[in-house]
Curated annotation (Swiss-Prot):
GO terms for molecular function: N-succinylarginine dihydrolase activity. InterPro entries: AstB_sf, SuccinylArg_d-Hdrlase_AstB. It comes from the Bacteria. It catalyses: N(2)-succinyl-L-arginine + 2 H2O + 2 H(+) = N(2)-succinyl-L-ornithine + 2 NH4(+) + CO2. It is an enzyme of class 3 (hydrolase). It comes from Burkholderia ambifaria (strain ATCC BAA-244 / DSM 16087 / CCUG 44356 / LMG 19182 / AMMD). Belongs to the succinylarginine dihydrolase family. The keyword Chloroplast does not apply. This is N-succinylarginine dihydrolase. The active site is at 174, 249, 370 (nucleophile). Substrate binds at residues 19-28, 110, 137-138, 213, 251, 364. The gene is astB. The keyword Ubl conjugation does not apply. Homodimer. Keywords: Arginine metabolism, Hydrolase.
Length: 446
């Protein structure tokens, strides 16, 4: 059956700020306490969605989550009216208010792991929301993620939306940022590739400076609950040294699509064995793996992290050629820019490079790949997504006007204590649910 890979990008929320909450994420730590521009952030992401939709790629939208999270603050012991809760948290524990106010759900690559119906045992598209248990500000996302996915992908004949795995370090799950899929065609059975940072119950190398957020046990559990064919499922360990260099998810050092793996030479432990396994497994499903390995001599790990070369989108055109979507920081790094020029001029599958200004997201450690969740859908499954979430001229105009109306153009850490920010956000999100036709999605609407 005909199928297409859709990218569902997260709309940046009204509380987008730089609180430095993500240890192991170099950009997040480096920009801590600086002022953010939520309006610019949201519009930068929206423009990327629109341009890719205009180029013929299937592009969807995922709404922001409600922030600040009064549920979290009340759980942590702050009481009273909503304004009182925010005031108490701001005075007594501003770091907790920052965690409750994070707009990190914008990075939907961490929202869930998705397996298309061509790969699963029951022939449905399976979603497992990521528990994101390594960081408080992200561990509060999965309930709302499940609600959103269950709203958009509601037909049980086509979709299965699971609960997140239990939020324990042994099952640390960071979603699709550590997962990719290879195939001959999107609608045919493929090979699912899970990358982990450490194993809870197996001896092996681990990072020493920054934590490994994804475990082997979590990856295996997701594959099992999705009913994947064991002979078409490959696991690999990310090199702990690159985690210590700031590669907190695999999508900061590697990206794959269809029959192509674009990766850094230092991305994996036992890389040649991984390449060989992927090649043999994909060959059994009718495709030949193309490995584009970037040598450290051309682009160092540090350059990869600062430019986010690999936190890119690798998209297939109808003619089979591929385009790489990168942040503008790649053009500002001389070595990375030179490599990209050489790549596009070569005879490989990647023929074009598209550059986007995503500066606001990048300063928090999120490039093009972070902002999107890939969902392969056949024609019947796409028709079952009935909400108004597919990017087109009309939706773009509505969302652009909505952002202009509701978002601030400056948000500093001290502004999180402003109780009117909660009211502004709720007003904006209430209107957004009407634009996207997703019903009463948020707690404050119920």
């Amino acid at each position: 059956m005909n199928a297409q890979e859709a990218n569902f990008d997260g709309l940046v929320g009204p509380t987008h700020n730089y609180a430095g909450l993500s240890f192991g994420n170099v950009a997040s730590l480096n920009n801590e306490k600086s002022a953010a521009n939520p309006k610019a952030a949201a519009k930068q992401g929206l423009r990327k969605m629109k341009q890719l939709a205009d180029l013929g790629f299937a592009q969807g939208v995922l709404p922001p989550q409600e922030r600040p999270s009064l549920r979290l603050l009340r759980e942590l012991g702050f009481s009273g009216k909503d304004a009182d809760v925010i005031a108490k948290a701001a005075k007594q524990a501003p770091e907790l208010l920052a965690a409750a106010s994070s707009a990190s759900a914008m990075w939907t690559a961490n929202a869930a792991t998705v397996s298309p119906s061509a790969d699963t045992g029951d022939g449905r598209v399976h979603f497992t929301p990521a528990n994101l248990c390594s960081k408080l500000h992200r561990a509060i996302e999965h309930d709302a993620t499940r609600r959103t996915l269950s709203t958009l992908f509601a037909d049980p004949a086509h979709f299965a939306v699971h609960e997140a795995l239990t939020g324990t370090p042994a099952l640390g799950d960071e979603g699709a940022a550590n997962h990719t899929r290879f195939c001959a065609e999107y609608g045919k059975p493929g090979v699912e590739f899970f990358v982990y940072g450490r194993a809870e119950y197996r001896r092996g190398p681990e990072p020493k400076r920054f934590p490994a957020r994804q475990t082997f046990e979590a990856s295996r559990a997701v594959a099992q609950r999705h009913g994947l064919d064991e002979t078409a499922t490959v696991y690999a360990q990310q090199d702990p040294d690159v985690i210590d260099a700031g590669v907190f998810h695999n999508d900061v050092i590697s990206v794959g699509n269809r029959d192509t793996l674009f990766t850094h030479e230092r991305a994996f432990v036992n890389k040649q064995a991984i390449y060989d396994t992927l090649t043999a497994t994909l060959d059994a499903r009718g495709a030949r793996l193309n490995v584009i390995e970037v040598p450290d001599a051309a682009v160092s790990v540090n350059d990869a992290v600062t430019s986010y070369l690999f936190n890119s989108q690798l998209l297939s055109r109808a003619d089979g050629s591929q385009v790489l979507v990168v942040p503008q920081e790649c053009r500002e790094n001389a070595k990375v820019a030179a490599y990209l020029d050489e790549l596009a001029a070569g005879n490989g599958p990647i023929r074009d490079v598209l550059v986007f200004d995503l500066r606001e997201s990048m300063k928090n450690g999120g490039g093009p790949a972070c902002l999107r969740l890939r969902v392969v859908l056949n024609d019947a499954e796409r028709a079952a997504v009935t909400s108004n979430v597919w990017m087109n001229d009309t939706l773009f105009a509505s969302l652009d006007a909505w952002i202009e109306k509701h978002y601030r153009d400056r948000l500093a850490p001290e502004d999180l204590a402003d109780p009117t920010l909660l009211d502004e956000s709720r007003t904006a999100l209430d209107e957004l649910t009407q634009i996207l036709r997703v019903g009463s999605l948020y707690d404050f609407q119920r």
